[in-house]
Structure formats: structure tokens, C-alpha cells
Curated annotation (Swiss-Prot):
Keyword Ligase part of the UniProt annotation: yes
Protein name, as recorded: DNA ligase
Ranges of residues in domain BRCT: 583-660
Binding residues for NAD(+): 33-37, 82-83, 110, 133, 167, 281, 305
Keywords from the UniProt entry: DNA damage, DNA repair, DNA replication, Ligase, Magnesium, Manganese, Metal-binding, NAD, Zinc
Organism, as annotated: Borreliella afzelii (strain PKo)
Record: active site: 112
Gene Ontology terms for molecular function: DNA binding; DNA ligase (NAD+) activity; metal ion binding
Protein family: Belongs to the NAD-dependent DNA ligase family. LigA subfamily.
InterPro entries the UniProt entry points to: BRCT_dom, BRCT_dom_sf, DNA_ligase, DNAligase_adenylation, DNAligase_N, Hlx-hairpin-Hlx_DNA-bd_motif, NA-bd_OB-fold, NAD_DNA_ligase_OB
Stated role: DNA ligase that catalyzes the formation of phosphodiester linkages between 5'-phosphoryl and 3'-hydroxyl groups in double-stranded DNA using NAD as a coenzyme and as the energy source for the reaction. It is essential for DNA replication and repair of damaged DNA.
Binding site for Zn(2+): 396, 399, 412, 417
Gene name as annotated: ligA
Length: 660
């Protein structure tokens, strides 16, 4: 009996996959919806009776899982890079002109979908996991939710290992329909798609019409020579690729490429989905490897971002905001205006110099844009209805302390300023720092305004059950807040050091400190008590300059900062982080390096990432201050320049031991 059920399940899965391909890839469905649904229900029934036969590639998983998703962070197996971008066609043409195609012109052009970036991992042809791009090194695990998108094959029909990039999006039509029923509407379809994808219950996600385009291989278990062949393979495997992708070869001209870009730009508003630009890629994979990568982006691809669409609005008021560093930033409150797919009600004015340069004041009519289709900005005054220009107050709007000008910006220097305090707490809880879930800016502001907390330390001593009498705070939410606070105590010392807010101390500098045996509070504290010795010691670390060295020394001689560390120590925080680095790897710490050529079995981003993890500092170009150049096969002009500058040359064999 069980063998018959197992066979029927296998037959149903095969048939449903066939219908999925006909409907979503070929656009030629052979059965009506009710027939499809009937077979899905039968498969669900059988899998419920015999759960041992339910596999990860089952089509029933596309309708949601009974399990709840916790969106844990998972490390990407390869760095997930961004794209370089330009905003005008002259710069785009210049980028194309610089590429040495060796009389074999090959470029692909496709719309840049304005959605949520996703990375799909297939193991032996089965979808193993799906991660958001995150910060490029770590992404959120949204596998259960991605499985609900019927355009994502759970099984490829081939036992291959693939890492693919795609964009999850929602159509303009569905965006408008869904937004009507939401208590808090989203400003654009990208945010809605991202919000849906991050819903905790995958059963809810299955009810939303998410779409996906797959557009790139990050690490393929298949051998391709060109992007053309790779895209065709994606189609055959059942993935949805953008039908507007076009390939230009040696028979084409740059003019034809630019004409196609102009055509896409002209028609962008007629597409069923939002786009914010066009992406150009070199099609030849061998040439891609020769062109290489920077730490941020591949050199073989370029995004042409559309000029920000603009609108006109009236400045109703100008408010002054205070950041965690005390920096004063003026912001214009304007009449609501719809620009590039989003409503804008405020826009940064940067600083006093910028306001003066455009002669802006309250009451003026201004041109507003979203730079890069993201950042709201006041570009210029269109109609001047005021007298003179707005002047940033000479006192902090929060604590009334006289502000001090440093460079182009004004700063509040009061360490007890309420605005500075609340912004520091927000920074402490933010994703890049302690990543304390549930503590949104709104929640933190509420706690601060009610005088429940005045610093980040209060988060660990406050009785959150006092919030039960306030609207929006129930047992479940409060328990989640408490659990998040407790979980943060287990974060590594590097996160605490970053979160505590030492001026200009970032992740890279912290890594350099740790790799030089300054990996605990006690070591840093002892060092900094002798200011002169500490200054000389820190300057010996390649990558640390005078300014950041002084900031570190000042911080570890500041009684307020020291007391914070002591309190965190008493709360059970880790005050030391082990760094496993042998004598051989110490040779790389602080060394500046660059790479050229290709490396057998390793992509350039992986080489860079592994050397950086050993303490080396990646540079994009060869200069006199470079410590060594890593040379692979088919090295480019960087090798010649390095030889002229007497920069040390290291082969792939020289560094291979560092990569394992």
C-alpha cells in the first residue's frame, strides 16, 4: 500500500511541475485552474497521510508551511556584490569604450527591476535555501517564504549545485489593489514586496502575488562561455527570466545599445513592474574574469540609473534634527508630492552652506527629486515667495546648548542632550550594531519620551511589564522585547564595541585592532592609559590613522564611556573576542593588497574576502603604498604598473595557503 502511495506522490509531483512550466514559463497552460487545484489537493492529502514521503521539492510547499520563520542570519557562500552605477549616457558610453572587447563586442541589456534582491541556493538540483542580499556577506533566511512563489522551481530536474541571483517584485496593478486594504499603505511596490517577503508566517506570504525574475549565476555547477547560454539554461530549468533582456554581439554597435536603452526608458511607465534603470553586462564570461571585481562591484557590469523624476512642492517649515554624534541637520517639511513611485513629505537640506547657496526659506516653491530614486532632495528654488534664506539656529533645538561649527556642519557638544541620547539608543539597537529585534525607532522614542529609558543601559534594567497598560503592548510583544534584550547579551564583543558609538570606529578598524591582539576591553583600556604610547602603538597598525587613533584613546579615557563598559560587563556581556590567527597569517595583518587576473577555482570576490579575513586591506588600484599585488592568469595592466613601482608580486601559489 505504501509503495503505491509513494508512486502516486511521485507521479503527481511530476505532472504538477509540467503544468507549472507550461503556465509560468511557456505561457501555454494545458489545463484549467480547477484541474490544477484538484491535483494539488490530492497531493496534500497523500503527504498528510504519509509525511515520510513529503520532500523539500514538493509543489505543496508553494502554498506555505505550518512552521514559523525566524529569519535567522546566514552567511552567503560567495560575496553578493552591488552594481556600479552611472546617471547619464555619456558616462555609460565611456564605460563601454574602456572595455577591450578584442574585436568581439558582446553586451547584454536588461531592465533593472525595482524589487527585493534574493539569492537562491540549489544543492543537487533541490532548493536548499533562499537568502536576502543583506549586507553582501550575511542575509536573512527567507526560504519558507520563497517556496510559496510558484515561479521558483523547488526541483530542477538535474542534480546540479547552483547559486542564483534574482529580484522579487510585485506588479503595479497588484500593488494598488493590495495597498487599498492595508491599514498602513506602502509608498511603493518595492517596499510592499520586501514587507511581504519578511512576513513571519509563510502561510500569509502564499496569499500574496509575488513574482520573481532570475538574472545571474553567482557560482554555477554548469559550464557556460557566455551570458546568452546561461540565460537560455535558466529558462530550460524552469526559471522566469526577463523577456526584455537583449544581447548585442560583434555585428552590433554602441549606438544600437544606446537606442535600446532609450526605448526601455521611454516605455518604462507601460511595464507591469517598476524599474529604476537598465543593467549592462559583458556577455563573455572569460572577459568578465579578466575585467574582474572591486570589493563593491563587478567591473563587467554597470547600472544606468534613470534621472530622478522630479516634482514641485511648497516648503511649509524647516526643522533642525540632531544626530547621535550631535550633528545638526536641517530638514524641509513640504506639501506631499509623488516622485519616482513614492510620496515625499520631507527632504534633507544638508547644512547651512547648501541652504544659503540655493537661497531657500519657508514658503518657497521648490523642485524636489529622489536622488537615485531613493533619497528625497530639494534641488532648487523655483518661485521665491520669502525674504532671504533660512538660518540654522545657533543653539541646539533639543537642549539649547550653543552649537559649534566643524567644517560645513554645526554640532551640539552636550553629552546629555536628549536628542543625542535617543539617537544613540536607536543606533545601539540597529541591525548593523546589536540588532535587537522589536526595538523600532518608534518604540525607542516612546520609551524615551515616557522617561522609561535615558540610555542604552536602561534597556537592560527596565521592567517591560510596566508597558502592559499602554496601547499596543501586550504580553506577547513584551515577552519578545525581553527575549531580544537577553539574546543581545550573547553578541560578540566586536558588536558591543561598534554599538557603543566611539566616533568613526567602524567594523574594519575593529577587525584591525583585534588582529593586533587588542581584542578585549581590558587590553584597550590598559593601552590607552598611556596616551603617547597608545598613539604610537595604534599608528603602527596599517589602516589606522591619527584621527581614529585619537578617538579611540579619548574614548578609553572618558569616564562616562568606561562606566558604560563596566555596566555591560556586570550585565554579562562578552568583553573579549577570540581571534584565531597563526604566525603565518599574522604576516597579512594590515597589509594593503590588490589583485589582477583570474584564479583557478576561486572567484576574485572570494580571494579578496578570504585575504581580508586574515587582516589584509583590499585596494582597488595599484599605488606606491601597496604592499603586494596578487597575480593570477591573464594579468592586466596592474602588473606592469606594480613592476614600475617596485610593488611586491605574489602568485596564486604564494597565497593559496591563506585561502584554505
Amino acid at each position: 500500500m505504501s509503495s503505491k502511495i509513494q508512486q502516486e506522490i511521485a507521479d503527481l509531483k511530476k505532472l504538477i511541475r509540467k503544468w507549472d512550466k507550461e503556465y509560468y514559463v511557456d505561457s501555454l497552460p494545458s489545463v484549467e485552474d480547477f484541474v490544477y487545484d484538484k491535483h494539488i489537493l490530492r497531493l496534500q492529502e497523500l503527504e498528510s497521510k504519509c509525511p515520510e514521503y513529503k520532500t523539500l521539492d514538493s509543489p505543496t510547499l508553494k502554498f506555505g508551511s505550518d512552521l514559523l520563520n525566524d529569519f535567522k542570519e546566514v552567511e552567503h557562500s560567495v560575496p553578493v556584490l552591488s552594481l556600479d552605477k552611472v546617471y547619464n549616457l555619456d558616462l555609460l558610453k565611456s564605460w563601454i569604450d574602456k572595455i577591450d572587447f578584442s574585436n568581439s563586442f558582446n553586451i547584454s541589456v536588461e531592465p533593472k527591476i525595482d524589487g527585493c534582491s534574493i539569492v537562491l541556493y540549489y544543492k543537487d538540483g533541490i532548493l536548499e535555501k533562499a537568502l536576502t542580499r543583506g549586507n553582501g556577506k550575511f542575509g536573512n533566511d527567507v526560504t519558507k517564504n520563497i517556496r510559496t512563489i510558484r515561479h521558483v522551481p523547488l526541483f530542477l530536474g538535474e542534480k546540479v549545485d547552483l547559486v542564483l541571483r534574482g529580484e522579487v517584485y510585485i506588479t503595479k496593478e497588484n500593488f494598488l489593489k493590495i495597498n487599498k486594504f492595508l491599514e498602513k499603505p506602502y509608498t511603493n511596490s518595492r517596499n510592499l514586496a520586501s514587507g511581504i517577503l519578511r512576513r513571519v508566517d509563510s502561510r500569509e506570504v502564499a496569499n500574496f502575488p509575488l513574482n520573481i525574475f532570475i538574472y545571474d549565476f553567482l557560482n554555477a555547477g554548469l559550464d557556460f562561455k557566455t551570458n546568452n547560454l546561461a540565460i537560455e539554461k535558466l529558462k530550460k530549468l524552469g526559471f522566469k527570466v526577463n523577456p526584455l533582456i537583449r544581447f548585442f554581439d560583434q555585428k552590433s554597435s554602441i549606438k544600437e545599445v544606446l537606442n535600446y536603452i532609450a526605448d526601455i526608458t521611454k516605455k518604462r511607465n507601460s511595464f507591469e513592474y517598476e524599474i529604476d534603470g537598465v543593467v549592462l553586462k559583458v556577455s563573455d564570461f572569460a572577459l568578465r574574469e579578466k575585467l574582474g571585481y572591486t570589493l563593491h562591484h563587478p567591473k563587467w557590469a554597470m547600472a544606468y540609473k534613470f534621472e530622478a523624476l522630479s516634482g514641485f512642492s511648497k516648503v511649509n517649515s524647516i526643522v533642525v534634527q540632531v544626530g547621535r554624534s550631535g550633528k545638526i541637520t536641517p530638514v524641509a517639511n513640504i506639501d506631499k508630492v509623488f516622485v519616482s513611485g513614492a510620496f515625499i513629505t520631507n527632504a534633507t537640506l544638508h547644512n547651512q552652506d547648501y541652504i544659503t547657496s540655493i537661497n531657500l526659506n519657508v514658503g518657497d516653491i521648490v523642485k524636489v527629486s529622489r536622488r537615485g530614486d531613493v533619497i528625497p532632495a530639494v534641488e532648487m528654488v523655483i518661485n521665491k515667495f520669502s525674504t532671504g534664506f533660512f538660518k540654522v539656529p545657533d543653539k541646539c533645538p533639543s537642549c539649547k546648548t550653543v552649537v559649534v561649527k566643524e567644517g560645513a556642519h554645526f554640532f551640539c557638544t552636550n553629552n546629555n542632550c536628549p536628542s543625542v541620547a535617543v539617537e544613540r539608543i536607536k543606533y545601539f539597537c540597529s541591525k548593523n550594531c546589536m540588532d535587537i529585534e522589536g526595538f523600532s525607532d518608534k518604540t525607542i522614542s516612546f520609551l524615551f519620551e515616557k522617561k522609561f529609558i535615558s540610555s542604552e543601559i536602561d534597556l537592560y534594567t527596565f521592567n517591560f511589564y510596566k508597558l502592559l497598560k499602554f496601547k499596543g503592548f501586550k504580553d506577547r510583544k513584551i515577552n519578545n522585547l525581553i527575549n531580544s534584550i537577553e539574546a543581545s547579551k550573547k553578541k560578540p564583543f566586536s558588536k558591543l564595541l561598534l554599538s557603543i558609538g566611539i566616533k568613526e570606529l567602524g567594523e574594519n578598524t575593529i577587525r584591525l585592532l583585534f588582529l593586533n591582539n587588542l581584542n578585549s576591553f581590558s587590553k584597550l583600556f590598559r593601552l590607552c592609559q598611556d596616551r603617547d604610547f597608545a598613539f604610537l602603538t595604534l599608528l603602527k597598525i596599517k589602516g589606522i590613522g591619527e584621527k581614529i587613533a585619537l578617538n579611540i584613546i579619548d574614548a578609553f579615557n572618558n569616564s562616562i564611556m568606561i562606566n558604560k563598559f563596566k555596566v555591560f560587563e556586570n550585565l554579562g556581556f562578552k568583553m573579549e573576542e577570540r581571534i584565531l590567527i597563526d604566525d603565518e597569517n599574522k604576516l597579512l595583518v594590515g597589509k594593503k593588497f590588490c589583485i589582477t587576473g583570474s584564479f583557478n577555482g576561486y572567484s576574485r570576490p572570494i580571494v579578496i574576502d578570504k585575504l581580508e579575513n586574515k587582516g589584509a586591506i583590499f585596494k582597488t588600484c595599484v599605488t606606491k603604498g601597496l604592499d603586494f599585488l596578487v597575480v593570477g592568469e591573464k594579468a592586466g595592466t596592474k602588473l606592469k604598473k606594480a613592476l614600475n613601482l617596485n610593488v611586491k608580486i605574489m602568485s596564486f601559489e604564494d597565497i593559496k595557503s591563506y585561502l584554505d
